[in-house]
Amino acid sequence: MNFSPNKNMPAGSGGNGQDRVLHRTSSSAGKNAMKGVFSQPHLSGANSSTHMYIHDSAVRPKLTAKYSYGSTYAVGSQWYDFSSSNRGPSNSYGSSYEDKFIMGNANRRRTGTPYQGNQFHGTHNHAHSHSQYSSSPHISSSRSKSSQKSDAKKSTIKFHHRTNNEISSIDKVNDPSMQGLICAGKTHLGYYKFSTVDNSMTCVHDFITSNNRNTPKGNSWILPNLSKRTKGAKISNIADVKCGFHNYSNVIAICNNSTDISLYDLNRTTPAEDPMIQILSGHTRAINSFDFNMSQTNLIISGGQDGCVKVWDIRSDSMKRQGRSDLNIKTANDSIRDVKWMPSHNFASLPSSADGKSLNISSPGYTFASIHDTGVLLKYDLRQTTQVDKKINAHSGPGLCLNWHPHQDYIATGGRDGKCSLWYVGDRRSTDQSPYSTTFLSSNATTNTSSIGIGYPGNPVASTFIPETTINTGSPITKLKFRPNYDKIALNSLIALSSMGDEAEVNIYSLARKYIPKHLLTTGKPSLGLVWWNSNLIFNVDSAGYINGWDITNEPTVLDELPKNIVRWRDVDGSGLLFLNQDTGSYEVSDQDELIDLHTFQKQSSSTVKGDTATPGIGLMANIKRGLSHNNVSHFPTERPIPKRSAFSNISKVPISSSTQSSVNKSSTSLSTLATQDELLENKFLKSPLVIPFELPEAYQYSRESKIMELNKRSYIPKVSSVRGSNIEVFKFLARELEFSFRQDKNNEDDAELSRQQSVNEENIRSDLMKRFDISENATWANIVKDKSNKTRERANSISIKQSPIVLSDESEIKSPTIQKLESGDNNVKYESNITKEIQQEKTKNFNPEYRINLLLELVESSNHNASVYSIIDDLPNFKIWMLIRDSLLWDIKMYSSFSENETPEELTGGQLEYPLTNTRKQSLVSDLSRLGTSELSSDYAEHPHAYHGKSDYSSDASEGIKSPVSKLGEQLKGEESNKFVLGRRLSSMSPKRSPDIPKLAAALKIHRQRNENNRESEIESSAIEEEEEDEEEDDDKFNDDEDFKGPATTKDNTIHSIPILNKREARTSFIDTFMTNENSPDAFHNVPYLNKNQSPGYGYSSPKNKNGPSHSFANTPSKLAFLKKLSPRTMSSHSVTRAPSSDWHVEHDPTLQVPPPEKKGAPDNLPPWNTTKLLRQIHANALEMGNVILAVNVLILFQDVYNIAPISIVKESVVHFVRLLHQYELFEIAAAILKYCPWDDLLGPEGDQSTVEIFCERCGELITNEQGKDLPHGYWYCQACSRTNTLCVVCNTPLRKLTMAALKCGHEGHFECFTQWFITEGMSECPAGCTAALL
């Protein structure tokens, strides 16, 4: 077989083992098809001459290069696998880089007709087979003259013989003079001889079919296992055949049936002789593998599905054996797939190692290894069978085969994961072991896994169990064999692989170059077994029943057939360029190469940055123990630098600081450990490929870093762009982020409830003791106990009263409903009276101005948060709506702040209570949708009251014992003879007792009227509280200096008119804008990178800022009442200073206290700037018209109890429909929180709190019913159909009766409380059942 390179074909990458190639062969209907696409990495090992020039760029994802043979004529199509298939470490001269270089098209053509049917058979088909089965290259017209010279070697098959039987295993006869092969199948055990002179092959004897056909009727004893009705004997479905060594070279062992090993004599070929010598029986399940000992030739080892290794001595008397083995070893693992003795080849020219010392290998006559279904590789010594010498987790899936290195302590394993891994299983006790006898690894995988690999001086590798190299084939490996040849350097060894599947080929790899096989031997059907006859001749059997043989000295290498012309961009962004030199390298390494690598490695290690240097003399694992991280391990000279992570690491989930994101030559994880371009070019002893970095321009790098830093800041921000693109995502985002409730639990009564419960428990214990010891209630001790318990209960009740959230202003004792119910017993009348009294007290508390202000502050905070959420998705209309609501609430807070703290609700309302009850039911747990904490506005108001009031608001006279009013204006409006006033649309009456400065008020009224006549346009400034208060101070100072002051103007009934204070000065920051300067304001929202305080705990991300929001500069703009006038037109009358904060809180005052309003003087009445109730009702109606469900429901839930927006029936129906809508979008936690914290309990009706959960048996699948009378002994955890319980808790070993359960990664289940106790309280990290894998 030969490949014809095309000028458009990619070149094979240089270096020993640098190219990763995954090849596949398929054939159908007897046709050999071939199409190839080779993919190779862009960088190669040190002893290769291929040069690679890389422009600096980011690391590409790992690729898996594949090529296949699928058609007779080559096609131009190809495909690439970008998944990372090589998870193991690289060998020393394998590719230093995991990345694959995508190659171009390779048009290839094969000639000749593949063998078909019975065209070739017997001993006369070898010549014809040779001419037909071999491929003759056809040179295409596009081939260059230089490429035609590579056709010196043609792929030829030397032996090709059809057996006409189903065969599945092959082995050689270990007698060089016989030149024989043994092939076995279900009904065939044949002895074949071949000749290297004429390439002929002949079946000498069939030990199964021949003896069965020639056996006379009276001589059935020759084959005792054959009955008279049997047409032919069968060996086994899992067939394996082996031949003995030396004096037992004539012994053949096969699996006669699934649990027996049959021994045949090769020399007994006549019908009169029984070829079967002995049957070894002892396994309880099928035998998968067996092997002859090369040193102690009388020993046979076998392993099977029962997980036992048995050693047989064929010298033992079979009559005395009685089905017992001479040695039985229980491996305590799963079934054994393959077992092999350590070989002891007697190489005639076996030299010493490179340093003149003999090789240090284990005792071959006592050592064996086994591979198991779990992927575990075990090494044993017969002299100590109770202890495993080595235990290695070789594969992620089942291990299928293994093979020992011919003369060194290495084992190659193949598994279902498609990997062929090389493991060192010897003991490196000598610190001066030469690296030349084995290898010196210098690949990038060694920095990740095993630079402590083969031949590292003084390296304690016995406990690391890291593969020295890994070959990825992409298909499960069923057979592998080392070439029986001595190689001074272990990486120069060849290994033949046979894969499971449709790959009709045998791949021969050099360990020095693991990505591209050295030879590719194609067959007509998938290969089932292979064997090396010597170091050059290899045989295999395929599923078509053919025996094929090749001489690898006459076979071309795959590397010679690869095209060499390719230029590619380094990555998707196009920041690097790759091309190849035409020198492809070789498959071998030399001693000089290792000397160069060792020298360069030491030089690079000593020149690395301090703290990042790894000590080569003690190995990588020792360096890791000394504290070197994965990123700071010094690289080998030809190794690709570890890729620099992005600004936000997906592994650590911690943003990387900008100091580690500087330019490429400054990063500790980039090219700092590589030599510069001049240094590389000066080192002429280094072989290609050379890594030459080209630094990016500083401007580009700076721009790139800026983007990374910006991305780092926004790493926790949700992807708003994806949210905006879908209406469903917008709905889910708003449902999670918006605040639907501001209420929180009254957690302060938990302590009282806990103390009460403890006291009740103690009382129950004492009562039980009294009954148990028959102590009378009249006894002294009993009376003491009862008296003590009563005192304890009273003390608990008093504590609960003090900590109850329901507190009256007069500090009267009101007990909580729970304690009232306990004390009332069966007296329901008394309990109902207590509840009624509690409701009345709640009403009284609701009319407290301080309580109202705190309530409004919570609503302001929720409104501000909702506005910020809408600004995230650039929803400007809804953002403005919530800003409008917030400003309206702030106006209400301003109105209530003018009330005196010692004014009772009766004084404020005239004895009538119309304020609706806010929430009389007991609160539940804290909501996941809102912060529900203390308002920042409230705390800011308490800490900095001067920000909201003038200096004159605080009275300096503390000796009078009267609390100073919050507002000076309120004090001026109070009369001395009146102790009540009514808050309505007009301030109708003033008490003279409350206002000692009546003359000043009269003068103020006169001055105000004069100012109003001169400049009525200044009335627009009356909305700012600070201006009003400062104007009052100026007026007071002016009035104090006026000696002609005579008192205020009054009407005939001595009623003082309201006085709006106006000023001509320029506008100042209003009261509303003052509130907008806190962190919850839109301006503060735009000035912070993300919302830490406004984010919902259940969402997990902070909301990003909106730079395009409408309120970006709103807080910094002076407040003009004209701006507010656009939102709420109004007029201001000369007799109206204030109003009720809302219509729901509007109180009908006493008619006897009303005073007729003054006559209007031409100016229309100016309405107040805000009317919250009307505003909210209009917003709700508009939301219903526009179909804005979230806004409509949000307004109802937040403000219904305060402002009475809609009838209660409509509110409940709206909430129910919204909850069902949340269920449709699987927002169950949001719906549950809304139902939990809304003020109405009966939203879903009587069945709203009920759920039906059907539990089925996990074994039989039947529905488990809990019938009456069976709930105590059985319950929902016992199945009546199969009479078995469900899964038991792995901790307490009791049935899982609750719905709250947990399952571990290993599959064990248990109660959540049990797992909490096991993992959290006790601090365990493993499964309670004893699983070996760590779970935490």
Curated annotation (Swiss-Prot):
Residue ranges of WD repeats: 233-274, 282-322, 331-372, 394-433, 472-519, 522-560, 864-905, 1135-1180, 1227-1266
Name of this protein: Restriction of telomere capping protein 1
Subcellular location: Vacuole
Zinc-finger is among the record's keywords: yes
Biased composition (Acidic residues): 1024-1044
Biased composition (Low complexity): 130-147
SUPFAM superfamilies linked: WD40 repeat-like
Gene3D superfamilies per record: YVTN repeat-like/Quinoprotein amine dehydrogenase
Function: May be involved in a process influencing telomere capping.
Similarity comment text for this entry: Belongs to the WD repeat RTC1 family.
Keyword Metal-binding: yes
PANTHER family xref list: GATOR COMPLEX PROTEIN WDR24
Keywords per UniProt: Metal-binding, Repeat, Vacuole, WD repeat, Zinc, Zinc-finger
PROSITE patterns: WD_REPEATS_1, WD_REPEATS_2, WD_REPEATS_REGION, ZF_RING_2
Biased composition (Basic and acidic residues): 942-954, 1010-1019
Comp. bias intervals (Polar residues): 113-122
GO process terms (BP): positive regulation of macroautophagy; positive regulation of TORC1 signaling
Main localization category: other
Organism field: Candida glabrata (strain ATCC 2001 / BCRC 20586 / JCM 3761 / NBRC 0622 / NRRL Y-65 / CBS 138) (Yeast)
Region (Disordered) location: 1-35, 107-159, 942-973, 1009-1054, 1096-1115, 1133-1167
Zinc finger annotations (RING-type) as residue ranges: 1289-1331
